């Protein structure tokens, strides 16, 4: 027996409530009485505030359900409208959607806001409205650390990129800001081969030596993607930047040398004072011992002659001992020292050099030619090196290599010298220790001794013959020539006829 199928009418039973998250469009507001509305997740372009559960107490609250769903739909549409208006570039629609009394900036699930969508589509008018009227931060990052300046740089809309970059930089955008993978705006411009963007960023102060998480510089991406014009430009800029930085660091090193010279002078003065005090103390001790020994010796001789020793010792020791106790101090001596007199410079008379007359080019046979055509010797014939003019700090300064390849400076009294110019260790040693450098011409760095057994040799001449040259120089291959080639190959002589 066939069962009759049960059909539910829409008027009699309400539809089932779905627990799936709602989409952006308006949803059905009819719900089963007594059920709870599921919490909606954050929609793309929606706020990040938590939504409370809406409870329906009875079927009579249908009007409240309609109002709640309509309110939610209007909120979602408004959020989407703000982001979409910024992406499209409709300024009037954007002003209508953005709430000037907002407390939080509307962000989607990827961290994008209206200013990010406007920058991604190069909508300069929307950028001006959001930054100037609604005070959006210029360096607002996304979830991946991308700022509007990062999003502006792409291959699309190349004509609109430069005005947007120029405007963001004038509003104070960080030109060297990095994403989570370490990319700067200059890295992105180098990847896309945008020469105009690269020039604008470099002129605004972008770091051409910045490295990303993989250790690549902007010029490395130009080489990877075969952007030759951009690579040449960056190479020239990097060379000029390195030369400028080197000149600045060398100027710092020159100032440091002047300070080290003054510091060394004060150290030597104090060192000389200490040694002078020690020498005077040793001299007093030696003098007292010597006078005492002489006194005791004379006392013994007088005692043998009948003179009391104590009277002789009192007369002889009174004068030198009192004089030694009242010896002037080193400081007083230094104050009493006369100022050093600079010896007058000798005055030399300027000697006139008599040079021989030039060769007589005239063809007069009656005049005898000039044979004395010697010239004074200007080449130094000495074998000893010339004294270097720069001051050498080897006796006062200790230069060691740090972990970054630079130099660490310490004086002889173990004081650390800071700050130190950011120069290579070899350059610092060459400037601070000029006496350690060779005075002769340096040999090429590639000239080093090699083992003679590893030098490639020519092939020894033997019975083997090479047919390459013979076949190259020959115009025709006749029968005797082919027979000789066959003999060389098989080493069997042809039968004689």
UniProtKB/Swiss-Prot annotation:
GO terms of biological process kind: cell division; mitotic metaphase chromosome alignment; positive regulation of microtubule polymerization; regulation of mitotic cytokinesis; regulation of mitotic spindle organization
This protein's encoding gene: Ankrd53
Subunit structure: Interacts with PSRC1; recruited by PSRC1 to the spindle during mitosis.
Subcellular localization(s) per the UniProt record: Cytoplasm, Cytoskeleton, Spindle; Cytoplasm, Cytoskeleton, Spindle pole
Keywords: ANK repeat, Cell cycle, Cell division, Coiled coil, Cytoplasm, Cytoskeleton, Mitosis, Phosphoprotein, Repeat
Recorded coiled-coil stretches: 239-264
Domain of life: Eukaryota
Residue stretches of biased makeup (Basic residues): 1-10
Ranges: ANK repeats: 110-140, 144-177, 181-210
Gene3D superfamilies: Ankyrin repeat-containing domain
UniProt function note: Required for normal progression through mitosis. Involved in chromosome alignment and cytokinesis via regulation of microtubules polymerization.
Annotated Basic and acidic residues bias: 28-39
Protein name (database record): Ankyrin repeat domain-containing protein 53
């Amino acid at each position: 027996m066939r069962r009759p199928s049960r059909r539910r009418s829409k008027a009699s039973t309400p539809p089932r409530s779905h627990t799936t998250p709602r989409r952006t469009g308006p949803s059905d507001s009819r719900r089963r009485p007594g059920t709870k509305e599921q919490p909606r997740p954050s929609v793309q372009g929606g706020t990040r505030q938590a939504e409370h559960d809406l409870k329906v107490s009875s079927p009579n609250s249908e009007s409240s359900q309609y109002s709640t769903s309509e309110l939610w739909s209007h909120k979602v549409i408004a959020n989407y409208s703000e982001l979409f208006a910024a992406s499209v570039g409709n300024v009037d629609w954007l002003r209508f959607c953005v709430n000037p009394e907002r407390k939080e900036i509307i962000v989607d699930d990827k961290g994008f806001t209206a200013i990010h969508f406007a920058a991604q589509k190069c909508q300069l008018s929307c950028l001006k409205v959001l930054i100037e009227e609604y005070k959006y931060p210029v360096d607002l990052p996304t979830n991946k650390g991308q700022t509007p300046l990062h999003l502006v740089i792409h291959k699309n809309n190349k004509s609109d990129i430069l005005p947007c970059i120029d405007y963001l930089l004038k509003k104070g955008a960080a030109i060297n800001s990095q994403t989570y993978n370490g990319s700067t705006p200059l890295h992105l411009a180098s990847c896309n081969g945008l020469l105009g963007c690269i020039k604008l960023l470099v002129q605004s102060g972008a770091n051409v030596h910045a490295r990303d998480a993989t250790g690549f510089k902007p010029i490395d991406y130009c080489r990877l993607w075969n952007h030759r014009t951009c690579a040449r430009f960056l190479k020239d800029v990097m060379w000029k930047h390195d030369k400028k930085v080197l000149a600045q660091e060398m100027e710092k090193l020159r100032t440091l040398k002047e300070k080290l010279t003054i510091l060394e002078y004060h150290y030597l003065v104090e060192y000389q004072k200490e040694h002078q005090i020690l020498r005077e103390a040793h001299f007093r001790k030696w003098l007292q011992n010597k006078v005492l020994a002489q006194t005791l010796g004379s006392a013994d001789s007088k005692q043998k002659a009948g003179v009391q020793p104590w009277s002789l010792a009192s007369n002889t020791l009174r004068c030198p001992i009192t004089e030694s106790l009242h010896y002037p101090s080193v400081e007083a001596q230094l104050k009493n020292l006369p100022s050093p007199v600079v010896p007058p410079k000798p005055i030399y008379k300027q000697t006139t050099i008599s040079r021989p007359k030039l060769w007589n080019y005239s063809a007069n046979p009656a005049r005898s030619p000039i044979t004395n055509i010697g010239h004074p010797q200007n080449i130094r014939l000495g074998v000893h090196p010339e004294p270097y003019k720069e001051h050498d700090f080897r006796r006062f300064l200790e230069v060691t290599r740090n972990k970054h390849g630079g130099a660490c400076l310490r004086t002889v009294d173990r004081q650390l010298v800071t700050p130190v110019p950011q120069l290579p260790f070899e350059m610092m040693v060459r400037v601070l220790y000029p006496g350690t450098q060779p005075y002769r011409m340096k040999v090429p760095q590639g000239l080093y001794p090699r083992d003679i057994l590893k030098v490639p040799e020519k092939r020894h001449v033997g019975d083997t013959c090479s047919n390459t040259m013979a076949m190259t120089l020959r115009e025709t291959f006749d029968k005797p020539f082919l027979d000789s080639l066959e003999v060389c190959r098989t080493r069997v002589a042809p039968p004689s006829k």
